[in-house]
Amino acid sequence: MTKLSVNINKVATLRNARGGNNPDVVKVALDCEAFGAEGITVHPRPDERHIRRSDVYELRPLLTTEFNIEGYPSPEFVDLVLKVKPHQVTLVPDAPDQITSNAGWDTKTNLSFLTELMDTFGQAGIRTSIFVGTDKEMIEYAAKAGADRVELYTEPYATMYPRNPEAAIAPFIEAAKVTRSLGMGLNAGHDLSLVNLKYMHTHIPWLDEVSIGHALISDALYMGLKQTIEEYKNCLRS
């Protein structure tokens, strides 16, 4: 079964735009769980423009599903993850001022750096995932670094899907097969939506997890959070 992890960063963005605590990020996360989400994802950035470190600490003891913290592994980020001990940490190669993730790791160039991080998090009992594109070599070096999983960066798929679904999914099927052959788990995320999620899941049914935030929260403005989560989970049913 492919798990749906809801990224709640956009909820925090809305809260921070006005100040105060409305919407309540913690309540939304707990409601997502109650409505069927199998995980919660947060991406705390250095400027705390959406999720704050205090949110991460507040969420950890309250969540009953998988907690995934993603981000660039700066010393501050590593320290936060080791203190909070989520179920999973997803490493992304973002610059501090980046609006959103837009590429996977060059795992070959960063092999020693990533290997050390995999060891650090692994010793703490935290499952590791490295954000990568579909290049076979990058996936192979993620395995060499000791990653438990990779998360495929799916923006190229989402962009091409409306024009040519078969061409859009083809490199991701191959990347998914390589990942499976190397014994790693498989996650996916970035620009997945109700438009393109079911097609991806149909062709890669062994996905362990999809992390979805922007599209899901946008859909919830029209359908409500409960129905939206149900619709996304329907896309993940065989």
UniProtKB/Swiss-Prot annotation:
Family matches, as InterPro entries: Aldolase_TIM, PyrdxlP_synth_PdxJ, Pyridoxine-5'_phos_synth
This protein's GO CC annotations: cytosol
Major subcellular site: cytoplasm
Keyword vocabulary terms for this entry: Cytoplasm, Pyridoxine biosynthesis, Transferase
EC number of the protein: 2.6.99.2
Residue sites binding 1-deoxy-D-xylulose 5-phosphate per the record: R45, H50, T100
Bilayer-crossing regions: none
Pathway: Cofactor biosynthesis; pyridoxine 5'-phosphate biosynthesis; pyridoxine 5'-phosphate from D-erythrose 4-phosphate: step 5/5
Disulphides: none
Residues reported to bind 3-amino-2-oxopropyl phosphate: N7, R18, D191, G213, H214
Transferase in keyword set: yes
Protein's job: Catalyzes the complicated ring closure reaction between the two acyclic compounds 1-deoxy-D-xylulose-5-phosphate (DXP) and 3-amino-2-oxopropyl phosphate (1-amino-acetone-3-phosphate or AAP) to form pyridoxine 5'-phosphate (PNP) and inorganic phosphate.
Membership in a protein family: Belongs to the PNP synthase family.
Protein name: Pyridoxine 5'-phosphate synthase
Record gene name: pdxJ
